[in-house]
Amino acid sequence: MNILAVDTAGKTAGVALLQDDRLLYEVYLDGGMTHSETLMPMIDTCLKLCGLTCADIDLYAVNAGPGSFTGLRIGLAAVKGLAFPRETLCAPVSTLEALAAAHTGEGTVLCALDARRAQVYSAASVSYTHLRAHETLRH
């Protein structure tokens, strides 16, 4: 299974490609919030370097927030546009759950992100094992 993951929720844009649970490609670009200009070339480069096309992608995973409203819209719109022609499945990924997934120990996990204007996005006791089938969405 080929999974193309896109993250545009923050200042850096990220693209990754997983093939059968193996990371083939990963890149982050700190372009100063210019995701609208950099995301599609990042995806194009990823696919070319991995020898794949959009037709080879089985699932698109996209950061669905919390994060920059404009950044999230750019990522979601790009993935929706790529998925639509072939009705490829798309899966929303929570920023906070993705952070919690890096925790390998036991116990409570507290994730927090700067929401600007002296506010914080946070979640406690987040458990994230694997993307479940019912969490996937059609374009």
Residue ranges of model-derived segments:
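N-terminal amphipathic/basic leader segments beginning at the initiator methionine
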Residues: 3-14
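Glycine-centered loop/turn positions within well-structured domains
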Residues: 13, 118, 138
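Acidic-residue sensor for enzyme active/binding pockets
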Residues: 7, 26, 135
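Nucleotide and nucleotide-moiety/phosphate-recognizing core
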Residues: 2-4, 18-128
